[in-house]
Amino acid sequence: MIFKILCSLLLVTSNFASALYVNETTSYTPYTKTLTPTYSVSPQETTLTYSDETTTFYITSTFYSTYWFTTSQSAAIISTPTASTPTASTPSLTTSTNEYTTTYSDTDTTYTSTLTSTYIITLSTESANEKAEQISTSVTEIASTVTESGSTYTSTLTSTLLVTVYNSQASNTIATSTAGDAASNVDALEKLVSAEHQSQMIQTTSADEQYCSASTKYVTVTAAAVTEVVTTTAEPVVKYVTITADASNVTGSANNGTHI
């Protein structure tokens, strides 16, 4: 009798344990992300010829070069006030040249890639008694040079940047006299204060053109070549969970008079 009870309880408990505890498998898929270039140099193809008395051989090789560029910050304009007001056109010139050289080599050949950027900034100032207009023209040349076994390949990109800065009209000095009525003196004083205030503040028109006081402008533009490749990979992870129940841990009892 007791043996039957124990067998029944063991079967019920085994079914319950099998339904409650199962193997669990968790898998993670690898994730890869690669940044794409914003500018790529066209491939350079080289053909070598070798011939003997009966046969001519052609060997063609292609060299690929890719550059990554990041967006440069906006050009910083540093204003340095002049001691005296210019009365004629006062041009100034700023030139900045940056050169970046990268060397590629294999067992037989060495490739040298040179990236040169030149920025030419020209400023011209008109008479300060008028609304002087300062024009800055930047001619940018980006030359990529690849040298291979005595042959040189050059690719040049040219872009022109036009920067326009407007100067406000210089204030005219209005002198006040002690003679005359008080109303005219107050009116002249208000005009003087208003003119000085207009010459010192920055005005913005409806076309978002900025006005500022007469000064010498220095514009510096810099650029740097940056190569970035980002790869993130997660390895798959497999997890197994197994729980077993031992029959010796199952106990049972039956009351007298119970028949199973």
Swiss-Prot record:
Q: Give the transmembrane region(s).
A: none
Q: Which residues are glycosylated?
A: N23, N249, N256
Recorded GO cellular component terms are: cell periphery; fungal-type cell wall; fungal-type vacuole
- What keywords is this UniProt entry annotated with? Glycoprotein, Signal
Report if keyword Transcription regulation is assigned: no
Q: Which residues form the signal peptide?
A: 1-19
- Protein's UniProt keywords contain Metal-binding: no
What does this gene product do?
Required for vanadate resistance.
Q: What else is known?
A: Present with 688 molecules/cell in log phase SD medium.
Q: What is this protein called?
A: Protein SVS1
Originating organism: Saccharomyces cerevisiae (strain ATCC 204508 / S288c) (Baker's yeast)
Its taxonomic placement starts with: Eukaryota, Fungi, Dikarya, Ascomycota, Saccharomycotina
